[in-house]
Amino acid sequence: NMRNINIPRNLGIPTPMGHELLCKCLSDNWNQITEYFKQKTSGQSMIISRIHIRKMRDTNALFEMNYKNWRFDGTPEPDIYIGKKYMVHADISKCFPSIYTHAISWALAGKTEAKCHVHDENLWYNRIDHFTQYSKNGETHGLLIGPHTSNILSEIILCAIDENLTKKYKCYIRNIDDYICYTDSREEAEQFLTDLNRELREFDLLMNHKKTEILELPLCVVETWIHKIQNQTSTLQKAKDYVDYKEIQAYIDFTIRLISKS
């Protein structure tokens, strides 16, 4: 799977029986999990995690990574960047492949308690850890990219990090492992990165420094390349009722050139 141009992303296929047992374990402990999420997010003035699994409206589907319905999900960015001077962009380095399964217990029970009872398989959070390993042939490092179970498990850890960050920072959002924070000064922006890095290290995660940047505001909400494609599309649509092959080919070539430059 190619998430970005020339950047491969390996999708994982779980051990079938192991994945079934993990799903059952999550189902059996769903009340504790939802209560955990409620506790971790109750103090948020807005939903920090913008992309997460949630029950779908008006459908029998159990889950979907749906975050496009602004009527229900809201769009907090216009409110939180007003008056701010800087935008911080940070990313977790190899987030899913780097997650240590024991860190799930650290988040659910607290690091000290989880380490004291690491071998007690009667504890619900240790069972989640155990079956997470089992779905990946007993490995303790890494969540598979693809299964919804991985999104639930990663949110357990990332929501614990959010809980600590929101005590100090109110104007930031997170798209899975991608953070955007708006600040009043460059010093505050740099401090956010320091604090984020410290919180990530508590769960053996690292920032991707190649994607870390501090930008001075204001900035365009929509990237320039998107505007160019929209303008090109508008020109095609207004020309006539149909588009011939040469125009389509020229449009595709134009788009490919933009991709190669981005």
Provide a role label for each language-model segment:
Residues I92-F96, T183-S185, I214, P218:
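Short, flexible loop/turn elements at secondary-structure junctions
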Residues E190-S262:
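C-terminal polymerase-core module
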Residues Y81-K84, H148, K167, N175-I176, ...:
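Short, well-ordered loop/turn elements at secondary-structure boundaries
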